[in-house]
Curated annotation (Swiss-Prot):
Annotated family: Belongs to the binding-protein-dependent transport system permease family. AraH/RbsC subfamily.
Gene: lsrC
Role played: Part of the ABC transporter complex LsrABCD involved in autoinducer 2 (AI-2) import. Probably responsible for the translocation of the substrate across the membrane.
Keyword annotations from UniProtKB, A to Z: Cell inner membrane, Cell membrane, Membrane, Transmembrane, Transmembrane helix, Transport
Name of the protein described by the UniProt record: Autoinducer 2 import system permease protein LsrC
Organism of origin: Yersinia pseudotuberculosis serotype O:3 (strain YPIII)
Length: 351
């Protein structure tokens, strides 16, 4: 059972989502509807985008805790560019470029300067957050044009253009990681860095690419945030890094690298967003969200560690059981002298 759960984390997350849907459907019959599903998906888009980027980084056995700050910085970038008179496309592209540069800088710190990822990104978390506050003077950005809001306006099947782009990115990343040699390089890098290098994998390039794409996904999340609410607070992005990591771990992405899928991370993000909707349904204050996210992350990490230890212990027991069985069989196996009395008599005579 434990081995099944360990090997089917995506299915476990999906089962948890369906179970929660069923329970909430019993409490409120209007909850179980297509409208509710699309509403949760719309709310989950920011976390889904962050989970996609975090997956790439975590697969390489690294972690990035600066994505919340990058999200806020890029949201401020697109807002300031729009208020300065730039077009929507140019402003969004500029924000994506800022996110990519921020992620690339993280990758340089980790890959070339050999700074541990958690230490490097803790530093850039403060750096990017401080830069965001310097640009805004600690004030909110308001008065954004209506064009930005249109990105989150439903157009087809109650899904916005950003929603369709998010689904396209999910499919593209799932295909990339599961069906290409480049995608498998992420798993190889995280599973065994030295072994991957000996096989010809450009591990430094893979890790820098992972951090850069993480920055791009954070920038896109910042654009989604600005388009959904129509203004940019001075604390945009706070706490999102914890939720992104929690979503990935919940969906089966290992902190030790080399294990997990994009689909699992997406299901984890969807489940966390669904939990937030439960808090709204129960009319709990908004500040419970971070507490619940931290509690879920801690619980999943403890469960994941205990589950991994139990599976490894079970595998060791099976190995030792086979070894013991083979030893017993070899001890009971008759020798040549036992089957041949004449050979036994000759041996005794020789003695």
């Amino acid at each position: 059972m434990l081995k099944f759960i360990q090997n089917n984390r995506e299915g476990t997350a999906l089962l948890a989502i369906l179970t929660l849907f069923a329970l909430l459907g019993i409490i409120d019959r209007n909850y179980f509807s297509l409208q509710t599903f699309t509403m949760i998906f719309s709310s989950a888009q920011i976390l889904i985008l962050l989970a996609i980027g975090a997956t790439l980084v975590m697969l390489t056995r690294n972690i990035d805790v600066s994505v919340g700050s990058i999200t806020g910085l890029c949201a401020v970038t697109v807002g300031m560019a729009l208020n300065a008179g730039f077009g929507l496309v140019a402003s969004c592209l500029f924000a994506l470029l800022v996110g990519m540069v921020a992620g690339f800088f993280n990758g340089i710190l980790v890959t070339w300067l050999r700074i541990p990822a958690i230490v490097a990104t803790l530093g850039t978390l403060g750096l990017y957050r401080g830069l965001m506050l310097l640009l805004t003077g600690g004030k909110w950005i308001e008065g954004l044009p209506a064009d930005l809001k249109s990105l989150s306006t439903p157009i087809l099947f109650s899904i916005s253009p950003i929603g369709w782009l998010t689904m396209l990115l999910i499919l593209a990343m799932a295909w990339l990681l599961g069906n290409t040699a480049f995608g498998r390089s992420f798993y190889a890098t995280g599973d065994n860095l030295q072994g991957a290098r000996q096989l010809g994998v450009r591990t430094d390039s893979i890790r820098i690419f992972a951090f850069s794409m993480n920055g791009v996904m954070a920038a896109l999340a910042g654009i989604v945030f600005a388009s959904q609410i129509g203004f940019i607070p001075n604390q945009t992005g706070n706490g999102l890094e914890m939720k992104a990591i929690a979503a990935c771990v919940l969906g089966g992405i290992s902190l030790l690298g080399g294990t997990g899928t994009i689909i699992g991370a997406i299901l984890g993000a969807f489940l966390l967003t669904q939990i937030d909707s439960v808090l709204v349904l129960l009319r709990l204050p908004a500040w419970w969200n971070d507490f619940i996210a931290g509690l879920v992350l801690l619980g999943v990490l403890v469960f994941d560690g205990r589950l991994r230890c139990a599976v490894e212990r079970n595998i060791r027991q099976q190995k030792y059981a086979r070894f013991t069985a083979q030893a017993i069989i070899s001890d009971k196996k008759p020798t040549v002298s036992d089957n041949n009395p004449a050979a036994s008599n000759k041996k005794k005579a020789a003695l």
